[in-house]
A protein has these predicted regions:
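Glycine-rich, small/acidic residue-mixed loop/short-helix segments
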Residues: 237-243, 247-286
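Contiguous alpha-helical scaffold segments within structured protein domains
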Residues: 41-73, 95-96, 149-249
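Structural signature of FAD isoalloxazine-binding scaffolds in flavoprotein oxidoreductases
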Residues: 32-46, 272-283
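Short coil/turn segments at secondary-structure boundaries
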Residues: 84-90, 121-124, 241, 259-260
């Protein structure tokens, strides 16, 4: 489906900002292979608004916690045989009078807690309204030079009061697996001069292990090709990818919609895509 109107808030700082685009903006649901918004003109694509409203309703279809934990245990037994992993998601629903009154105000207030994230309030008639705050850049490409960067973001822990993270073996191992898989995919896509470094990245109340990965490509169509290669990320789906996606389709009872997909912003010099990692979906009236 295509949308005739797209309203959003975005930027590295929690404030309204206008982006004049000359190419396309699109969002893709998790593992769908379909771009929801694609080929829109700049005038069609962006509206910065302080009046977007949505009506929050009581949601009665949260994922049952007992069933969710049962599925997790069943999944562990299956993936242990292949030394892999599959990542199940769940839905937590609720009601917010503040959200029903003014979605924009709620989003801006939340974004104050995540100033280093990519923060966006997105609305289309087809998808409803989504509040997204993500630290994860799926892909950044300089279109003139072919320089690309991406990241592996797997290890997670609550941010300690002193800011000094002591990572356990599980987080370190999973970070290495995700990093190695991304680098393997980039090598398959003939990305050259691949290099990386690892650091800690704070995002709100949690801190992640983050491996920044860089390279160069000569392919003129590399941006879209690399998006298809990198998404869904191992941290959101699991590994090996084909097996993990099969297990997710078997065990999950709900569509992920935009969760775990990505949002892309392009202009004539740079193309960037961000994983819709942390997000909340309101109803689609607005």
């Amino acid at each position: 489906p295509r949308s005739k109107s797209l309203r959003w808030i975005c930027g590295d700082e929690p404030r309204l900002s206008i982006r004049r685009l000359v190419a396309v903006d699109f969002a893709r649901p998790y593992s769908s292979g379909i771009a929801i918004y694609d080929g829109l003109t700049p005038d069609e694509a962006l509206r910065v608004t302080g009046t977007a409203k949505t009506t929050a309703t009581i949601c009665t279809d949260s994922t049952d916690e007992a069933l969710y934990m049962t599925d997790i245990e069943s999944l562990k037994c299956i993936v242990a045989r292949s030394n892999g992993k599959a990542v199940l998601s769940r839905i937590i629903c609720g009601q917010s009078q503040a959200l029903a009154k003014d979605t924009v105000a709620v989003a801006l207030d939340y974004f104050k807690n995540t100033p280093n994230n990519f923060n966006i309030l997105l609305h289309t008639p087809e998808t409803g309204t989504w509040i997204v705050s993500t630290p994860e850049r799926l892909l950044d490409m300089k279109l003139d030079s072919g320089r690309i960067s991406t990241m592996a973001l797997a290890g997670t822990m609550p941010t300690p009061a002193d800011g000094l993270c002591q990572w356990d073996i599980k987080n370190i191992r999973e970070q290495a697996i995700v990093s190695d898989e991304i680098i393997r995919q980039l090598n398959k896509a003939h990305v050259q001069n691949i290099r990386n470094y690892t650091c800690n990245v704070a995002s709100g109340a949690v801190t992640h292990i983050c491996t920044h990965i860089y390279g160069t490509t000569a392919s003129p169509n590399a941006y879209r090709e690399l998006l298809d290669i990198l998404s869904p990320t191992p941290a959101l789906g699991g590994w090996p990818r084909h097996t993990a996606l099969q297990l997710i389709r078997k065990f999950e009872k709900h569509p992920r919609q935009l969760y775990g997909g990505y949002i892309s912003i392009e202009d004539d010099k740079t193309a960037q895509a961000f994983v819709t990692l942390r997000c909340a979906h309101t109803d689609n009236q607005g």
